[in-house]
Amino acid sequence: MPEKYVAAIDQGTTSTRCILFRHDGSIATVAQFEHKQIFPKKGWVEHDANEIWNNTRRAVGEAMAELDISVNDVVSVGITNQRETTVVWDKNTGEPIYNAIVWQDTRTNDIAQRLAGDEGPDRWRKTTGVRLNSYPAGPKIMWILENVEGAREKAEKGDLLFGTIDTWLLWNLTGGVDGDNGNPALHVTDVTNASRTSLMDLKTLKWDEDLCKAMDIPQSMLPEIRPSIGDFRTVRARGSLAGVPIRGVLGDQQAAMFGQCCFGNGDAKNTYGTGLFMLLNTGAKPKWSDNGLITTVCYQIENQKPVYALEGSVAMGGSLVQWLRDNLQLIPNAPSVENMAKSVEDNGGVYFVPAFSGLFAPRWRPDARGAIVGLTRFANRNHLARAVLEATAYQTREVLDAMVTDSGVDINALKVDGGMVMNEFLMQFQSDIINTEVVRPKNIETTALGAAYAAGLSAGFWDSLNELKEQSTVDKVWKPKMGEDERKQLYSDWNRAVERTYNWEESTNEPS
């Protein structure tokens, strides 16, 4: 019997990939295409939504051709995407009226402040789960309607559609302007992506009418909200995946949770990418943070209650190593930072606080700026390299501590993924400073795997969450080796270093 596969479309910040997974969760093939990063002004980041759609088609076609398989060999397709990135397009032409505004973009800081008013960035957090800053999609839609000529009028007439990248891809995959087999294209999103807009009520999982009015966003623009795992219809009757059912849609960090099999209350994962993104499964009820975290939907299976999560994001992770390499030119390449860090016995009293654009969760100090603290003539570039890696671990502990406090759940192990998890020094130090096991899976492509798991589970390719957990394999586990006194001293010194960075920038904008 011919082997069957599940396809995952992984649309990220820098590239679009199609990965075909076997039944055992292993990767059969990968096709990847990068897209342009557009920086029109300081703090602005845009993508060409048409380029992303074209790259999606190319990646799917190349992956299918690489294995020389047909649509009959693909059971289902799942989609995972960069969250919050916002596309607004004309439903009559299929053309975006402006470039996609990327999640990193900070142009909406003023809009967010305007919305926050005297109540501050937490004004609607008990409804939406998110803070009012430049991250969520809602203020990005507002900016487009306020600044693109004719946009407001078209929106009021019902001619414009909004979507995060998942919605944009789904609309095109199901026919776009022409629809498919007499059906209009699908204009939908899933609960995880909708929870990043600042427009959805986390408890009802519906668009909040009062918030839409407050942001002056016509509800006719907004997609239908559906569970993450279920029947999203089939791909249009042309192209490399023609007729294949779309069965799973998840935002990238939630997909990584699903790929890490974080299905139980108290399961946590941290993704070490450009930034750091930690999520903690909090079960069937949303937990509201008193410690600077946001509340989000983790996933929802069709005909079941949603599962919620707490999330903390840190702006600088792997990008710190890039900064050492490209800006300071202290290291020849990214992998060399590990050997440099291991070449010294300790950090030499040096602490690096990477508050380049303020501090994110859980401190949320937009006034902070980066600093290197504790320098003496003894310190050298190896100490600085070590301090950079240690900063990543300290920031992770801050988020983890906040999660434990907010949830009341003890975290017995931290599952990790992302490019930096291959750095063994960092992983051991991470385990030491949080005094908890750190677990790296064999397959670190957990984001795409999560989309595949979601789609395959819905299609019956896998029978249950338990089956997925049983086939999940561990590559390595790090256990704490550091003594309690040393751990306390290091973390105390880190906190002193961080406090030195406060009140530097006069602007009160939220970091983004």
Swiss-Prot record:
GO cellular component: cytosol
A Pfam family: FGGY_C
Known regulation of activity: Inhibited by fructose 1,6-bisphosphate (FBP).
Catalytic activity as recorded in UniProt: glycerol + ATP = sn-glycerol 3-phosphate + ADP + H(+)
EC number(s) stated in the UniProt entry for this protein: 2.7.1.30
Role of this protein: Key enzyme in the regulation of glycerol uptake and metabolism. Catalyzes the phosphorylation of glycerol to yield sn-glycerol 3-phosphate.
Protein name according to UniProt: Glycerol kinase
Native source organism of the sequence: Corynebacterium kroppenstedtii (strain DSM 44385 / JCM 11950 / CIP 105744 / CCUG 35717)
